[in-house]
């Protein structure tokens, strides 16, 4: 009987590997055959803005025919071109239409018109983790652990497909009706087999190797996980300053201060993730994600139960019914002006 847990772990590991192998096949098919123009703008009633970005906004919309509610990301083609983000947007759409995992937001439709690109995703009504964190200050360790486990599984899935997210942060984690997470915003995500060099992401969350303009790999997402867990448990990120350059200096120095209230297990995990030396960073070693999933801080986590959403969430967002957007901030609304001539046709031909 002594080795029963080890046998169970091995069986679980094998079933995870089987799942990931099948998921890879499904992903590669959709990656190689991307869906185009699966709806049109007149099929949706635009209700209100849920969020704003540099070249567009996300709106709550209702499908006229089915009555279903969705989150529609509307991107201004000319602004995307001006800000040299064409490749990022094409990547985002191609990745979103090919992935399928419980903790990743799902793309339902995509289309374009003369002026805009549209990504229509499932609507996640609980709002951003960022807003929740601001409201409560910080999460207890069990609460942070519940969320962190879902991000670990999502990143494990993405990495098995050679995808790097590159922008994991509380603003990009939405809370669903059950209190589980949905990772959103794949604007910086990229399919990379080896290394890549692009400087992108959010200052507080950038790994040192990105700042130092070294080629970097998937390990940047595990660094970002460390920043995320720290921010959830402490209430602010580990590397913080007024100017990005000061933040970068702190990140590259690798010095992290831990409040005494954190458990020793959590401090150990964070030191292993916020590790400047890539040959020592958890997630990037011989055991891969195993070093993270088998860490003492996750000792009480049942990974299968989390994946199947069988664990009771520590927080359930208020939700009065379809179309309730009270968990999102208010924004000024403005009319979409659609040109009579097609803009940037060449740049977005494959969208």
Swiss-Prot record:
* Pfam families documented for this protein: Pkinase
Could you tell me the superkingdom of the organism this chain comes from?
A: Eukaryota
Q: Which residues form the Protein kinase domain?
A: 44-298
Q: What is the name of this protein? A: cAMP-dependent protein kinase catalytic subunit gamma
Catalytic activity of the protein: L-seryl-[protein] + ATP = O-phospho-L-seryl-[protein] + ADP + H(+); L-threonyl-[protein] + ATP = O-phospho-L-threonyl-[protein] + ADP + H(+)
The record's tissue-specificity note reads: Testis specific. But important tissues such as brain and ovary have not been analyzed for the content of transcript.
Outline the extent of the AGC-kinase C-terminal domain: 299-351
Spell out which residues are annotated as carrying Phosphothreonine. Answer: 198
Gene Ontology biological-process entries? high-density lipoprotein particle assembly; male gonad development; renal water homeostasis; signal transduction; spermatogenesis; vascular endothelial cell response to laminar fluid shear stress
Q: Which UniProt keywords apply?
A: ATP-binding, cAMP, Disease variant, Kinase, Lipoprotein, Myristate, Nucleotide-binding, Phosphoprotein, Serine/threonine-protein kinase, Transferase
The species is Homo sapiens
Q: List the disulfide bonds.
A: none
Enzyme class at the top of the EC tree: transferase
């Amino acid at each position: 009987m002594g080795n029963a847990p080890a046998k169970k772990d091995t069986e679980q590991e094998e079933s995870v590997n089987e799942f990931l192998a099948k998921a890879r096949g499904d992903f590669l098919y959709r990656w190689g055959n991307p869906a185009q123009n699966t709806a049109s703008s007149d099929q949706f009633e635009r209700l209100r803005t849920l969020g704003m970005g540099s070249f567009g906004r996300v709106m709550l919309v209702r499908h006229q025919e089915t009555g279903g509610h969705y989150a529609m990301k509307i991107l201004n083609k000319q602004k995307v071109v001006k800000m040299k983000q064409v490749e990022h947007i094409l990547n985002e759409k191609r990745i979103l239409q090919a992935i399928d995992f419980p903790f990743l937001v799902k793309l339902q439709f995509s289309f374009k018109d003369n002026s805009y690109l549209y990504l229509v995703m499932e609507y996640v009504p609980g709002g951003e983790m960022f807003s929740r964190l601001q409201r409560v200050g910080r999460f207890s360790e069990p609460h942070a652990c519940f969320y962190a486990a879902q991000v670990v599984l999502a990143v494990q899935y993405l990495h098995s497909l050679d995808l790097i997210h590159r922008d994991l942060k509380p603003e990009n984690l939405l809370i669903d009706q059950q209190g589980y997470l949905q990772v959103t915003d794949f604007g910086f995500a990229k399919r990379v087999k080896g290394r890549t060099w692009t400087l992108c992401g959010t200052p507080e969350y950038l790994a040192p190797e990105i700042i130092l303009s070294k080629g970097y790999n998937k390990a940047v997402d595990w660094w970002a996980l460390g920043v995320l867990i720290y921010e959830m448990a402490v209430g602010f990120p580990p590397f913080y300053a007024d100017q990005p350059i000061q933040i970068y200096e702190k990140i590259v120095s690798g010095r992290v201060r831990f409040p005494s209230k954190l458990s020793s297990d959590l401090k150990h995990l964070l030191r292993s993730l916020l590790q400047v030396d890539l040959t020592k960073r958890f997630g990037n070693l011989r055991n891969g994600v195993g070093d993270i999933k088998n860490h003492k801080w996750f000792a009480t986590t049942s990974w299968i139960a989390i994946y199947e959403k069988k664990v009771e969430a520590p927080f359930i967002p208020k939700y009065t019914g379809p179309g309730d957007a009270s968990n999102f901030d208010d924004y000024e609304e403005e009319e979409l002006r659609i040109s009579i001539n097609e803009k940037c046709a060449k740049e977005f031909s494959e969208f």
